[in-house]
Regions:
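Conserved SAM-binding strand-loop segment of SAM-dependent methyltransferases
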Residues: 84-90
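Conserved acidic residues
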Residues: 60, 85, 99-101
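Bacterial N-terminal signal peptides that target proteins for export
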Residues: 1-7
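Beta-strand-loop-alpha-helix segment that lines the small-molecule cofactor/substrate pocket
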Residues: 102, 108-109, 113-139
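Acidic-histidine catalytic/liganding microenvironments
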Residues: 54, 97-98
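N-terminal Rossmann-like dinucleotide-binding module
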Residues: 10-13, 19-80
Length: 139
């Protein structure tokens, strides 16, 4: 029994009786997720490369307040995928993209909140790289 058949059977047995399970055809196992990178230092680019290496993601947008970092990341990303991501100097314009599935936030601890909250306002899926350490001042 295939995955699709199993899901349809499960929906029918749980009381959600219909001739066709709604939403099952919309979820493709070959889906490619469009990612927007926020924070173009080495950590952000390396996390993004991991996403791209799965074959299920591509970078469509890049934002960093430091233009030189964004341009460097754009060149590096273009070398590992077919199409170059668009560079943005306005975070809100990047979030306005309808095709943006995931916002990958890899910025310093001090800046994470503003980028996270703004992505929430735009109802985006978020992957945030959180540092797991405390500075000497926080101890």
């Amino acid at each position: 029994m295939g995955y699709k058949s199993f899901c349809c059977l499960l929906l029918l047995l749980t009381g959600n009786v219909s001739l066709r399970a709604q939403g099952i055809d919309d979820i493709s196992p070959m889906a490619i997720y469009n990612i927007g990178l926020v924070g173009c230092d080495s950590i952000g680019v390396n996390v993004l490369k991991t996403f791209i290496s799965t074959g299920e993601a591509r970078c469509v947008a890049v934002f960093d307040e430091k233009t030189t970092l964004a341009e460097s990341a754009e060149r590096e990303i273009t070398s590992i995928q077919d199409k170059a991501p668009l560079l943005y100097n306005d975070y809100c314009k990047m979030l306005d993209r309808r095709d943006l599935d995931i916002v990958l936030i890899a910025v310093s601890k001090e800046e994470q909140d503003k980028f996270f909250l703004k992505a929430c306002e735009y109802d985006k899926n978020i992957y945030i790289e959180i540092s797991q350490c405390l500075s000497p001042e926080e101890i």
